[in-house]
Amino acid sequence: MLNVCDLSTDGCFTFGAAVGAVVAVSGHPFLSILAAMLAGVGSGFVTAILQTKLGVDSLLAGIIVNTALYSVNIAVMGGSSLINMNRTTTVFTMMKDALAGTPLKGREDILIAAIAVILVIVFLVFFLKTRLGLAIRATGNNSDMVKSSSINPVFTTIIGLCVANSFTALSGCLLSQSQKSVDINIGQGMVTIALASL
């Protein structure tokens, strides 16, 4: 939408998974989702600042942030490359307990994934129809036209990357809670999958 290739996706996905896992292990499975999304916003903000304020090429900015996030993720995970969540209460275990004895028993993974996808789609449908959402879309199509319309393309780029990375981190958080573990390489190849899906 912004006509920007964000190569920090791999690191951001792992960042969301790591932050979500750490918060979930501390006993807050729902708060972990919000924390992971906020971590993604931070990652997107740094990437956007490198591109817009420091004049770094979008590809290089993504590579820089992705590389930096490796060290950040190790620090978040307490210096370990793996977090085991086998005895941790997650949104998936809570949903599993709630669905016990119902026809949906054993379908908690699909159900939570479906809920997450629906919520994201609903948010984007409404957000992209707002004034800010339309400005973000216009920035990707023609930044010169946006400038002539007295819209700040720097601001719209920052917001766009923050929103995109928050959803990337959300995906990482949900995957970590689903498989009950986080590995430092959990996000490897995510940017390839994202580009292929486009």
Please place each PLM-identified region on the residue numbering.
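Transmembrane helix-bundle core of multi-pass membrane transporters
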Residues: 58, 62, 66-129, 158-159, ...
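Single transmembrane alpha-helix segments in multi-pass membrane proteins
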Residues: 1-29, 33, 49-55
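Helix-loop-helix "hairpin" substructures at the membrane interface of multi-pass membrane proteins
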Residues: 43, 106-183
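Membrane-interface helix caps of multi-pass small-molecule transporters
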Residues: 1, 22, 45, 49-54, ...
